[in-house]
Amino acid sequence: MPIKEVLHDDRAVFVCPECQKEFTAEYREPEGAFAAYRRDAYERQICPDCTAKHEADKRTAEAEQRKLMLLATLDDRMARAGFPEKFRKMDKPFVRDTAVWMWQNRQHSLLASGATGTGKTSSAAFVIREIMKQSRPRVMYRTWQMLQAEFVKAKTTDNDNEFYFFERLDELDYLVIDELVGKRGEATRLSPSGQDLLFNLVDGVYSEARKTRVWILGNFYDGAIDRLIDDPLPTRRRLQESFKLAWFERGKPVDENISIYEEIETE
């Protein structure tokens, strides 16, 4: 019988019906219309250890169910984020060193630089996909041309669309911007709207007004940023101080010692 002994102070010694261990718990002699129901509840009461095990098993089952749901929606979430189809199912990175660096720095805003073929886009997609396996981050992938076109459209439309454009970006966990600078020599001066957009994004990270992690991917060779912007020093300083920077080159270690702003320069 689960109730072994009634003690003083409204407590009793019970025998756990699952593990047969004795334990003490609150007990009041059942009375009235619900006496049979309360007595049955006492008879089925289990010990704290078995209760904790049931709760742990329940949490494990719920976590496994959440994981299965995350995996079931993974491809669709990558597509809705805007990643090109060929990068939506990245279960293995093309360039391991690049992917490892991005994974290790996934909690930061990034400026990932390197020539075509160094795995910037594929690694970003791989890391975002790995994050999506564990949670539901709000992610947007855009090439620079796509994002700039959306910004220009917002600026030239009434009803405060420019405000809502940035508000939407501010709600993201990750904004991945690809192809800001292509092959060496392809960096050309951004339009005034493009320069405004780039500075707003970089300054938002620098000032901590924007909690979104901004990942900028491109071939930022020496002088590339200067060719993009009329007044490059403020942007370069903010990138240097607020972003994790790295240069990728096939067959060589990741270079994190790059500098795009020197303290002797003044704004």
List each model region and its residues.
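P-loop NTPase Walker A phosphate-binding motif
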Residues: S122-R136
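Loop/turn-to-beta-strand initiation segments
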Residues: P137-R138, E171-L175, E208-I216
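Short glycine-rich substrate-engagement loop in P-loop NTPases that contacts/grips substrate
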Residues: M132-E171, T188
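Walker A/P-loop nucleotide-binding motif
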Residues: Q107-A125
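A short, basic N-terminal segment
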Residues: M1-D97, N257-E267
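N-terminal flanking helix/linker immediately upstream of nucleotide/cofactor-binding cores
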Residues: D97-W103
